[in-house]
From Swiss-Prot:
Keyword Oxidoreductase carried by entry: no
Keyword entries, A-Z: ATP synthesis, Cell membrane, CF(1), Hydrogen ion transport, Ion transport, Membrane, Transport
UniProt name for this protein: ATP synthase subunit delta
Gene Ontology molecular function: any one: proton-transporting ATP synthase activity, rotational mechanism
Stored Gene3D superfamilies: N-terminal domain of the delta subunit of the F1F0-ATP synthase (1.10.520.20)
Entry GO terms, CC: plasma membrane; proton-transporting ATP synthase complex
Keyword Membrane recorded: yes
Localization in the cell: Cell membrane
Family: Belongs to the ATPase delta chain family.
Main location: membrane
Amino acid sequence: MAFNENRVINNYAEALMEVSGKQTAKVLSELQVIELVFERNKELAQTLDDVSVSSQQQEAFIGILGKGCSTTTKNFLETLADNRHFSLLEEIVENLDQRVSASNNHSLVIAKTAIPITAEQSKRLSKIAQKKFGYQHVEVKNVVDPNVIAGVILTAGSKTIDGSIKNKLVQLNNHIKQAVGKE
């Protein structure tokens, strides 16, 4: 994910948190349900973000999707449509969820590993994340990414601890390049 996308995702989540106020939990719940629709139909977000889809078609879809939702949620969906950012919905909802959890001194920590982790490893990572990130309660969600090679990348909101072999190899490569460049 590009740095600019991360900034956009953070901005959306922060704005949603601010605008929804005491209704944040409700808005988050509504968006999680809507996210399931997009999760089941992967091409839907790309289609809605496509410039060939007219504003009227987007509005019609939002009318159906947002039926029964709060005004804040509907307005947010309209903003995503206007900016053609439906493809970022999953990450925005995840970011908002992390912000809500953090405001309750609870955090969802993403543990990116090359292979699935065991329940025992999840407990150990939870304790490590509590100490490193400063949360009282931590829920660990494992995301498998073969690019990690080995080790783990822990992410809580905008904070990351990269203990992956891939990162260590990149650092080693940079040190070697610097050493060779100085000779």
